[in-house]
Amino acid sequence: MTKKKVIIVGSGISGLSAAYYLYKKFNVKIFEQNEYLGGHTHTHTIKINQELVNVDSGFIVFNNFNYKNFIQFIQKLKIKYQISNMSFSVTNRQKKYEWSGKNFKSIFLSKNSLTLRYWRVLKDIFKFNKLTKQYINSEIVSKETVSQFLSSNKFSKEFLDFYFYPMCASIWSNPVGKIKNFKIHFILSFFSNHGLINIIKKRPIWYTISNGSKSYVEKIFKLVGEKNFIHEKVLKINQQKKYIITSKGRKYKFDHAIIATHTDSAKKILGKITLDQKKLLNMVKYRGNTAIMHTDTSVMPKNKNNWSSWNFLNRKKNFALTYWMNLLQNLTIDKNIFVSINCDDKIKKNKIIKKIKYSHPVFSNKTQDIKNKLNEVQGVNGVWFAGAWQGYGFHEDGLKSALRIVKKIR
């Protein structure tokens, strides 16, 4: 019996996982416009003191609380992973203030612990955690924005400036101005689900893939087969006649087309896009960020005791975040490697290893609308939409979106 044809546009976690779960029963073809496979799973092999080391710049960590499908996925692939560190620091150089939640010493034995504003931050962290538990399943705050919720509950400016907004900006790679307009219920759900409201007990264990996240990408590449990965940009999807046209002018027919790209890219390639499809894809916008892999320590906290896995630097116009890759990936090299977002003008040119462009979703107040509209458009004309934008924007969300499609068409 002839296998049905499945075309997958995009080789991020959504596209790759869909390919993995379908390739045995379907004739699967994956199209990727970039030179590398993986999307935000992006590992770079760099040379440090004559030693080659794999460093990630996109997807880095996952945990045992919220990535259950992803853990099952990589365990099936027999991919090794190890415990990581997920500490966080905030630096505000204008106000000569920095803190880290790395350990007991950095929290309670630092110079900051002697200041009133520091204790305001701690007090409001406990207050926010308590309110999250109180409102997580409540309709009372279902329509409130982040800004409205924080104002009505009278959180201190110190809490907002030195904890809450830096944390949210770092998690979603969005500036504070955008975070203020997020739906508060979206934030409360995320903080609760990810154990961020648990100070001591029930904290998630964080992991990183050994030797770089590209390990699972390479495994899927081998299993699905090199011939089924096509490095061509998809220019158009003809929904009525069920074929695609690529940048090389080639035509490929399909029974099912899984669009595992960002929403803005999906809109561009859909020929005769339906009104419902357009409404769905317009619900999630994307904004670009520049990531720089480098060795410049100047963007880190001045006090090295505060160096953490994630390091937020306050800036007037935009957020800046630096990942300390040695700590996150357990790198055993004698040089510190960092990946910074929105720090272009702060990093010395002779310290730069690589620049990478990424786009991240900007979440609106339409979470439930997205789910409802998805149910209406999925599978129409054999076209399916996958992507982390259907959830919180992370690896598990992308994988879950693919699993829902696989369940429907397999």
How should each PLM-predicted stretch be described?
Residues 235-361:
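Mid-domain catalytic core of redox enzymes
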Residues 187-243, 247, 252:
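Helical element adjacent to the flavin cofactor pocket in flavoenzyme catalytic cores
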Residues 100-102, 318-410:
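Conserved flavin/dinucleotide-binding core of flavoenzymes
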Residues 44-70:
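N-terminal glycine-rich dinucleotide-binding loop that anchors FAD/FMN and/or NAD(P) in oxidoreductases
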Residues 23-47:
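Glycine-rich FAD pyrophosphate-binding loop
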Residues 64-189:
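Mobile amphipathic helical/loop "lid" adjacent to a hydrophobic cofactor/ligand pocket
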Residues 4-30:
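N-terminal Rossmann-like FAD-binding beta1-loop-alpha1 element of flavoenzymes
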Residues 14, 36, 264:
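Conserved Rossmann-like nucleotide-cofactor binding loop
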